[in-house]
Curated annotation (Swiss-Prot):
Pfam families: Ribosomal_S20p. The gene is rpsT. The keyword Transcription regulation does not apply. InterPro entries: Ribosomal_bS20, Ribosomal_bS20_sf. This is Small ribosomal subunit protein bS20.
Amino acid sequence: MPIIKSAIERAKTNVKANERNSAQLSTMRTAVKRFEQAKTAGADNAEELYRKASAAVDKAASKGLIKRNKASRDKSRMAARLAK
């Protein structure tokens, strides 16, 4: 356990940031998964779900949760999947 006051504060901040980042990543993964499931099932709303998933990936990349190249790769793969 930290003893120094600033270390205690940083530990609290790290816990909050971890929760926030985990929630954001989970939201992104869920959006991508919903798009994949809709496309597999042949649902009509696949294009709308693609836009939501793409926005979620962009948001995660802008916040530094995933790297820009991964975001670009994921979006490219989803776009190719949508075009099929």
